[in-house]
Amino acid sequence: MLIKNAKIFVGKSFLEGDIRFGKTIEAVGRLEGEADWDAKGCYVVPGLVDVHTHGAVGEDFSDGKAEGMQPLADYYAAHGVTSYLATTMTLKEETLTPAMHVIRDFHRAHGAKCAGVHLEGPFRCYDKRGAQAAENLHKPDVAMFHRLNEASGGQVKLVTVACEEEGGMDFVSQVSQVCTVSLGHTCCTYDQAMEAFARGASHATHLFNGMDGLHHRKPGLIAAAMDAGASVELICDGLHIHPAVIRLVHNLYGDRLNLISDSLRCAGMPDGDYELGGQSITVKNGKACLTGTDTLAGSSISMLDAVRNVVRFGLPLADAVYAASTAPALAVGLKDVGSIACGKAADLLVLDHHLQLKAVYVDGEQQ
């Protein structure tokens, strides 16, 4: 495939030129040959990488339903995501284990690629557990992590932990040898967070949500992540984080910012009542809350929505694309995706100047 005359995202900026690819990217620049597509006025960007998504279109990875996996892969691709981490809820080990088996055994027919698992629970603190059932919380447990990772076929790429809980620091030290460890759903202080980062943690789960806010005398995880050089997630639906704070985080953290969807099964679905980890949530005007409360419960947006939102909030398009593709791939060690370079997977999006999706390629195949 040869696409010509596009604005191609390479590194951290756009260049005018052409791109040739098969299953992998073969060449970028001014290329000889007749174009298969003259994409003048369009952008070619890396396929988006969502490292924090629980589900969509009525499906949730924690359900452990094999028949739900392909519809999810198709949904993600249709909304610009070419690689994702299947993200779990805070549930009992006996519920998470069969869900790990389903993810392990999934072989997509088409759509986005499942690049692994994000264990967002159950190693959370009570006070910052979010929209999760308290009875399913568990102290950080290295042996449990290894059992769940084995059940997934060794596919856990990211795990969220409250490092201040009993056993939390040892968990960080040991598990960071296996996958990326993120601090989140935590009551940790600045000093505790800095110790965890020194022990091997390198990421923060949905910054500002599920942690103490930034205080000038108690800076907490938010400042620690900045000082430690950690990558940080943001839910950019316009509900979880004010646009001014998104701009602030972008200015402070730069290319360590990771856009995520944190999407639930309600994404791509109408408003109504849905189930989340054994609890009821209500979605109204796209806002998901625990039923009868104002407690936010994840989002209903796609990653492409997040990109469009942050551009609307004032971020440069190049920075938005980087934060939704290259940065998350780097954060969780996905080496073959997330950027446009020769030899990497031809996971590509073509967007028009309104950021509407014109084409999606996964391993060079149009979806």
List each language-model region with its residue ranges.
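Active-site gating loops and adjacent loop-to-helix segments of metal-dependent hydrolytic enzymes
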Residues: 74-85, 126-153, 195-207, 218-231, ...
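Metal-dependent enolase-superfamily TIM-barrel catalytic cores that perform enediolate-based chemistry
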Residues: 99-120, 127-190
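Di-metal (Zn2+ and/or Mg2+/Mn2+) metal-binding site signature of metallo-dependent hydrolases
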Residues: 42-64
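His/Asp/Glu-enriched, well-ordered alpha-helical/loop segment
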Residues: 223-232, 250-263, 267-351
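Histidine-rich, glycine-flanked metal-binding segment
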Residues: 1-45
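Divalent metal-dependent hydrolysis catalytic cores, especially in the metallo-beta-lactamase
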Residues: 54, 70-99, 112-126, 152-166, ...
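Conserved, mostly hydrophobic/aromatic
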Residues: 41, 119, 175, 204, ...
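Active-site core of metal-dependent hydrolases
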Residues: 150-269
